Amino acid sequence: MPIGRALAAGTLALLAAPALALEPPVNAGAAFLEAFEAACVPQRQSFEGTKANAVAEGWVAVGDDHHPELAALLEKSRAEMTDPDYPEWHGILAPYAQDIDGRPPYLIVLHFIAPGTANYIGCYLYDFDALDVIDPQLVTAFTGNPIARQSDQDGVKSYLWGPPPGLPGTGDVYLAHIADDSTTVAITGFSGLAIKFDTYEPGSGKGD
């Protein structure tokens, strides 16, 4: 089981398609990206630190049943993190909610523990009600990298940027929007907007 397939599985699948030129998005999304940066960047190398930082930024811990798409996403993610070939590998998911500019996004912080290889902390922000992807140039400015891959197929717009040079240990940054009628919803458990990155945990292997 490859590391990172848990919450990333659906998004990675979106980015496997050939690169296509995309039209400018309707939603500029600065507030969404700012919320992601504020919650995910400062303590990204620590699971407990990221959770504490999220609370300091106004996020409130919620249960799986806070939103049906959150419940479906978490259920699928937990299933992806269970593999009989790697019984010691496991993940801990911490979901949070907050109102941002009148919208109800959800933050998920992941601690994936993989003895024998490397642990990582994932930070994922979702807006299940978003109608379009945010302006990808905002993410280009955030990462300091050009878009490495993009696609627009089956109601899914997706983008990938390489590891941000200013964030040591952090991997690729993914951005995607999934339309309500996309067949990808059956894979991900949700429609709407998502942005994410994973950071290797210091002292656990790769990324030390």
Residue ranges and their predicted role:
Residues 22-33, 65-101, 105-107:
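Accessory recognition modules or surfaces
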Residues 87-161:
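Long, charged/polar, surface-exposed segments that mediate recognition or autoinhibition
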Residues 55-70, 75-85, 140-155:
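Short secondary-structure junctions
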Residues 16-18:
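N-terminal signal peptide c-region/cleavage motif recognized by signal peptidases
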Residues 139, 145-208:
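Glycine-rich, aromatic-bearing surface loops/beta-hairpins
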Residues 1-10:
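Bacterial N-terminal signal peptides that target proteins for export
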Residues 22-52, 112-136:
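Terminal, regulation- and interaction-focused segments at domain boundaries
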Residues 12-14:
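Primarily N-terminal secretory
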